[in-house]
């Protein structure tokens, strides 16, 4: 399909090179440094160059507050998410001088300026720039960098100055619409002069529509939030969004028709690794066969291990019995062999033989009577044959014998329980193995299902505990507020182990053991929760990684024309501001002249059909078939800088009359400015 576009990551900018020929080519008081200090992007260069040397985002990044700042194109796309990012601007006003200083440091360093700055500076500022913002800028330029002179001007007016010759009368009477990232301004020019008192500002720019588009995508596709960063959303807005050319509501209704909506929509295909289902089925069958082979191999290994163990025990038993047989033929050799085998007495040898027979045949040899006879000999002698001391000793041995019998009884009981548990476990393992061999796929699916149910129960119990903790915390807060009720404040109940929890833990351990045995590729529940495990047999397709932009394509740019209706910002729309705030204040003849020449500048006017929409709206308020010229800046990224360059070249001989020198700054204060075509209104 033609309306499917692949997701492309934003490439990081190339590092700017340091200028090597500043001393020979640019270090001249007659060559101004031009800085278009935009709130979104900064452009800087020399007036004798045809284009700026530096173009970068107006952002400053830091790892820590004490670390060196990363500025300009040294700030890569991947750094934005891990650094603390600051902008010198709030909206389009300078509010953070340290960040602006870092930007100036970057500019002058890349220009190759090592010591004194010999060039004058032209720098753009926002319309109706507050005095305290200009104060920050003047202090930096004159006191920090020792600039000789500076000119302040408005970027949109410089842009108009650079292209006004394209109008038939040189733009004598014109309407300028400057829509940037953060704000939009409307100026009207009468008799080659800007009427600053009638200039209007709207706090909506391209950034507002980008934010709105990003929120819509995040709401519509929450699983794909990470792809749509601010920069990437701005990129797709510039590539795929467009302004309604005429009646917005009528175009909006077109999306009610499924066929038209499909034709007008675009799809962003996010990164996705395509699945070959034929290979997937082959892989599934291979895994099933591998599991069967694994089961057979496990049985074979277990049988082999049991046989080896049995053979080893039989050989050891035969060796010990041969030693015991020496007692009947050669007592002396028997005693020597006992010592060489580290047996202290014949009793130790017999005990080992009995233990081996128990392991091999499961028959217990009763040797306790012999042990008791040797350990408690007085118990087997009549009282009449014992003296008083021996009777006391016999009484003591009887007590010891009773205690020993009790311990042996407990041990036998524990051994029996262990034996039963072991038999039960062996029987369970045997049944599980039979189930696995019968149908490996169904068996593993059942194991995963049982495991998921336990994890769901755990999650539900955890939520209940959190709610209970909130209730307890609120209760303690009420106790603090009410000091009369302080009987058990601060006390914590003993944590009692939940039998159900303990049983679930045992069941989970068994399931993990079985999964590790029959499905080694399975991930332990201790590492990954059930939310992260996809159900067996469920696969994602390319459509699951597609983001469709339909009505959003015209809805987001419309925020400039209907900010209150769409995003709830209590501002006039662009056309409403033009009509009610500017044209209604002008005489009919002047209104006709001003609206005959319209100049569009700023990055936001590059939105598709923006010029057509302005033509449609302005034509509604003009006489039918009256001439109307709408001129859009050739390159909105460089237009203000190029216009400022043209203005500098035109005013080279008049520089002292339009610039503020350091002496002016020191004598007349930071709020002193000189008027020229592109300057703010001077109240001096």
UniProtKB/Swiss-Prot annotation:
It is found in: Nucleus. The keyword Aminoacyl-tRNA synthetase does not apply. Residues 392-443, 481-500 are annotated as: Disordered. InterPro entries: Actin, ATPase_NBD. It holds the Pfam family Actin. CDD domains: ASKHA_NBD_Arp5. Residues 262-469 form a coiled coil. One of its GO terms (biological process) is DNA recombination. Keywords: Coiled coil, DNA damage, DNA recombination, DNA repair, Nucleus, Transcription, Transcription regulation. GO terms for cellular component: cytoplasm; Ino80 complex. Residues 402-443 have a biased composition (Basic and acidic residues). Belongs to the actin family. ARP5 subfamily. Component of the chromatin-remodeling Ino80 complex. Proposed core component of the chromatin remodeling Ino80 complex which is involved in transcriptional regulation, DNA replication and probably DNA repair. This is Actin-related protein 5.
């Amino acid at each position: 399909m033609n309306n499917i576009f692949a997701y492309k990551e934003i490439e990081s900018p190339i590092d700017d090179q340091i200028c090597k020929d500043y001393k020979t080519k640019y270090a001249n008081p007659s060559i101004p440094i031009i800085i278009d200090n935009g709130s979104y992007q900064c452009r800087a260069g020399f007036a004798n160059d045809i284009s700026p040397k530096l173009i970068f985002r107006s952002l400053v990044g830091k790892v820590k507050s004490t670390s060196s700042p990363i500025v300009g194109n040294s700030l890569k796309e991947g750094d934005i998410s891990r650094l603390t990012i600051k902008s010198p601007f709030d909206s389009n006003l300078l509010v953070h001088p340290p960040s602006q200083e870092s930007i100036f440091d970057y500019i002058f360093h890349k220009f190759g300026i090592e010591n004194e700055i010999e060039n004058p500076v032209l720098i753009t500022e926002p319309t109706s720039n507050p005095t305290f913002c200009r104060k920050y800028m003047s202090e930096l330029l004159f006191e920090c960098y020792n600039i000789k002179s500076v000119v302040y001007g408005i970027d949109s007016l410089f842009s108009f100055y650079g292209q006004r010759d394209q109008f038939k009368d040189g733009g004598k009477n014109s309407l300028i619409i400057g829509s940037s990232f953060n704000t939009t301004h409307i100026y009207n020019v009468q008799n080659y002069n800007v009427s600053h008192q009638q200039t209007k500002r709207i706090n909506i720019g391209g950034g507002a529509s980008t934010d709105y588009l990003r929120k819509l995508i995040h709401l519509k596709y929450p699983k794909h939030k990470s792809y749509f960063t601010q920069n990437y959303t701005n990129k797709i807005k510039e590539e795929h969004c467009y302004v309604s050319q005429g009646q917005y509501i009528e175009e909006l209704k077109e999306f009610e028709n499924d066929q038209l909506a499909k034709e007008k929509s675009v799809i962003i295909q996010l990164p996705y690794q395509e699945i070959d289902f034929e290979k997937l089925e082959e892989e599934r069958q291979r895994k099933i066969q591998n599991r069967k082979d694994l089961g057979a191999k496990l049985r074979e290994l277990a049988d082999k291990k049991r046989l080896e163990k049995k053979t080893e025990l039989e050989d050891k038993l035969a060796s010990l019995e041969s030693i015991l047989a020496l007692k009947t033929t050669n007592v002396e050799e028997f005693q020597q062999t006992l010592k060489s085998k580290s047996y202290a007495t014949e009793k130790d040898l017999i005990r080992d033989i009995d233990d081996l027979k128990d392991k091999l045949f499961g028959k217990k040899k009763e040797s306790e009577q012999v042990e008791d006879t040797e350990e408690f000999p007085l118990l087997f002698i009549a009282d009449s044959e014992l003296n008083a001391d021996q009777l006391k000793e016999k009484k003591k041995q009887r007590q010891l014998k009773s205690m020993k019998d009790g311990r042996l009884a407990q041990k036998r009981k524990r051994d029996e329980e262990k034996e039963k548990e072991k038999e039960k476990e062996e029987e369970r393992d045997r049944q599980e193995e039979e189930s696995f061999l019968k149908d490996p796929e169904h068996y593993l699916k059942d194991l995963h299902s049982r495991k998921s149910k336990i994890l769901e129960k755990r999650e539900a119990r955890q939520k209940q505990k959190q709610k209970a903790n909130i209730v307890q915390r609120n209760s303690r807060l009420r106790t603090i507020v009410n000091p009369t009720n302080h009987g058990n404040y601060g006390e914590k109940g003993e944590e009692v182990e939940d039998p159900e929890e303990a049983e679930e833990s045992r069941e989970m351990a068994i399931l993990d053991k079985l999964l590790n045995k029959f499905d080694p590729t399975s991930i332990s529940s201790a590492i990954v929760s059930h939310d992260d495990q996809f159900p067996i047999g469920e696969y994602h397709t390319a459509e699951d990684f597609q983001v469709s932009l339909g009505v959003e394509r015209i809805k987001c740019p419309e925020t400039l024309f209907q900010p209150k209706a769409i995003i709830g910002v209590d501002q006039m729309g662009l056309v409403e501001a033009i009509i009610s705030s500017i044209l209604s204040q002008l005489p009919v003849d002047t209104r006709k002249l001003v609206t005959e020449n319209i100049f569009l500048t700023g990055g936001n006017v590059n939105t598709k059909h923006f010029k057509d929409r302005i033509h449609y709206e302005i034509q509604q308020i003009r006489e039918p078939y009256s001439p109307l010229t709408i001129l859009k800046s050739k390159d909105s990224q460089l237009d203000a800088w190029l216009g400022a360059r043209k203005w500098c070249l035109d005013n080279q001989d008049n520089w002292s009359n339009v610039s503020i020198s350091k002496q002016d700054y020191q004598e007349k204060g930071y709020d002193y400015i000189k008027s020229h075509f592109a300057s703010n209104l001077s109240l001096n």
